[in-house]
Protein backbone atom coordinates (compact mmCIF):
# COMPACT_ATOMS: atom_id res chain seq x y z
CA UNK A 1 0.00 0.00 0.00
CA UNK A 2 1.31 3.43 -0.92
CA UNK A 3 0.77 6.15 1.69
CA UNK A 4 1.15 9.90 1.20
CA UNK A 5 3.20 11.10 4.18
CA UNK A 6 2.52 14.73 5.08
CA UNK A 7 5.19 17.38 5.47
CA UNK A 8 4.93 21.06 6.37
CA UNK A 9 6.15 24.11 4.48
CA UNK A 10 9.14 23.92 2.17
CA UNK A 11 9.06 20.12 2.27
CA UNK A 12 10.23 20.01 5.89
CA UNK A 13 8.98 17.61 8.51
CA UNK A 14 6.41 19.10 10.88
CA UNK A 15 7.07 19.86 14.52
CA UNK A 16 4.66 17.90 16.73
CA UNK A 17 3.74 20.90 18.88
CA UNK A 18 3.44 23.45 16.07
CA UNK A 19 1.58 21.75 13.24
CA UNK A 20 -1.95 23.06 12.60
CA UNK A 21 -4.30 20.11 12.91
CA UNK A 22 -7.42 21.95 11.74
CA UNK A 23 -7.49 20.12 8.39
CA UNK A 24 -6.39 16.75 9.78
CA UNK A 25 -9.90 15.39 10.30
CA UNK A 26 -9.53 11.88 8.93
CA UNK A 27 -8.22 8.51 10.06
CA UNK A 28 -4.76 7.20 9.46
CA UNK A 29 -1.37 6.53 10.97
CA UNK A 30 1.31 8.85 12.31
CA UNK A 31 4.91 8.74 13.45
CA UNK A 32 6.62 10.88 16.09
CA UNK A 33 10.42 10.93 16.17
CA UNK A 34 13.40 13.02 17.11
CA UNK A 35 16.42 13.85 15.03
CA UNK A 36 19.69 13.16 16.72
CA UNK A 37 22.65 15.39 17.03
CA UNK A 38 25.88 15.51 18.92
CA UNK A 39 24.12 15.09 22.26
CA UNK A 40 21.25 12.70 21.48
CA UNK A 41 20.43 9.71 19.31
CA UNK A 42 17.81 9.81 16.56
CA UNK A 43 14.87 7.56 17.13
CA UNK A 44 11.23 6.84 16.46
CA UNK A 45 9.30 7.46 19.66
CA UNK A 46 5.77 6.47 18.70
CA UNK A 47 3.62 5.00 15.95
CA UNK A 48 -0.05 5.88 16.32
CA UNK A 49 -3.27 5.17 14.49
CA UNK A 50 -6.91 6.18 14.54
CA UNK A 51 -8.67 9.51 14.17
CA UNK A 52 -5.57 11.59 13.59
CA UNK A 53 -6.47 14.95 15.10
CA UNK A 54 -7.56 13.43 18.41
CA UNK A 55 -4.68 10.96 18.62
CA UNK A 56 -2.05 13.62 17.86
CA UNK A 57 -3.60 16.02 20.40
CA UNK A 58 -3.41 13.23 23.00
CA UNK A 59 0.30 12.80 22.22
CA UNK A 60 0.91 16.52 22.63
CA UNK A 61 -0.59 16.35 26.13
CA UNK A 62 1.46 13.36 27.27
CA UNK A 63 4.63 14.20 29.25
CA UNK A 64 6.69 11.75 27.18
CA UNK A 65 6.26 14.03 24.17
CA UNK A 66 7.06 17.38 25.83
CA UNK A 67 10.27 18.02 23.82
CA UNK A 68 9.49 20.95 21.48
CA UNK A 69 11.80 19.56 18.78
CA UNK A 70 9.88 16.34 18.15
CA UNK A 71 8.92 15.73 14.53
CA UNK A 72 5.65 14.42 13.14
CA UNK A 73 4.30 13.00 9.93
CA UNK A 74 0.98 11.36 9.18
CA UNK A 75 -0.81 9.62 6.35
CA UNK A 76 -4.45 8.95 5.57
CA UNK A 77 -5.61 5.33 5.60
CA UNK A 78 -8.93 5.17 3.78
CA UNK A 79 -10.35 1.98 5.24
CA UNK A 80 -10.72 1.42 8.99
CA UNK A 81 -10.07 -2.29 8.46
CA UNK A 82 -6.52 -1.43 7.26
CA UNK A 83 -5.46 0.73 10.24
CA UNK A 84 -4.22 -2.07 12.49
CA UNK A 85 -2.34 -3.91 9.75
CA UNK A 86 -0.61 -0.73 8.52
CA UNK A 87 0.28 0.25 12.10
CA UNK A 88 1.59 -3.28 12.74
CA UNK A 89 3.93 -2.99 9.75
CA UNK A 90 5.18 0.44 10.81
CA UNK A 91 5.72 -0.81 14.35
CA UNK A 92 7.76 -3.79 13.08
CA UNK A 93 9.89 -1.69 10.73
CA UNK A 94 10.38 1.50 12.77
CA UNK A 95 10.66 -0.05 16.25
CA UNK A 96 9.27 2.87 18.28
CA UNK A 97 10.31 3.33 21.88
CA UNK A 98 6.66 3.65 23.02
CA UNK A 99 3.42 2.45 21.56
CA UNK A 100 1.03 -0.41 21.24
CA UNK A 101 2.09 -3.59 19.52
CA UNK A 102 -0.68 -4.80 17.21
CA UNK A 103 -0.21 -8.57 17.59
CA UNK A 104 -3.50 -9.72 16.08
CA UNK A 105 -3.10 -7.83 12.80
CA UNK A 106 -1.30 -9.25 9.79
CA UNK A 107 1.15 -6.48 8.77
CA UNK A 108 0.47 -4.72 5.48
CA UNK A 109 3.60 -3.33 3.81
CA UNK A 110 3.62 0.41 3.16
CA UNK A 111 6.21 2.95 2.11
CA UNK A 112 8.05 4.29 5.14
CA UNK A 113 7.78 7.96 6.05
CA UNK A 114 11.48 8.77 6.15
CA UNK A 115 11.76 7.74 2.50
CA UNK A 116 9.02 10.21 1.50
Q: PLM features: residue spans?
A:
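Generic secondary-structure transition motif, activating predominantly at the C-termini of alpha-helices
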Residues: 60-64, 91-94, 98
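Coupling/hinge elements of helicase-like and P-loop NTPase modules
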Residues: 96-109
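A broadly used, surface-exposed interaction patch
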Residues: 54-73
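GIY-YIG nuclease catalytic motif and its immediate N-terminal context
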Residues: 1-58, 78-92, 110-116
Amino acid sequence: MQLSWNKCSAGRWCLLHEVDLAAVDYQGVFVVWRNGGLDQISGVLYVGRGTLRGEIIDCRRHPVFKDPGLLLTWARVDHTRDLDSVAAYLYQRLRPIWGEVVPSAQPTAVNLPLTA
